[in-house]
Amino acid sequence: MSTIFSKIISGEIPAHKVAETSEFLAFLDINPLKRGHVLVIPKKEIDYLFDVEDELYAGLMIFAKIVAKALKKAIPCKKVGVAVIGLEVPHAHIHLIPMDEVSDLDFSKPKLKLTEQELSETALKILNAFKD
């Protein structure tokens, strides 16, 4: 089964990537709750996060932590929230969301509609935060 995330990994579908290793990828959510909303995924296609084997799961969490630190530098916020929903795309993924209040993690709220330029600028800010 080839998910939209697998197509992003292969380059078939473009994405605003902010971090990548041989096993993991982080990219901007195109329907974000807040500017800087990042999705972190294993490159191995596994539907449910808690079905990911332990070593890969631990690596994913460490990768998410690294991305979250850069995200917090790039997008001023009190904290970077973490959410696992997994109902829309059958590929394990973690949401990293800049937050200043609990309601920033409310997935029932309308999503932002950012332009391609706004997404590119946000991705660049996060990429540059890795260099600091």
Cite the ranges covered by each PLM segment.
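HIT superfamily nucleotide-processing domains
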Residues: 1-132
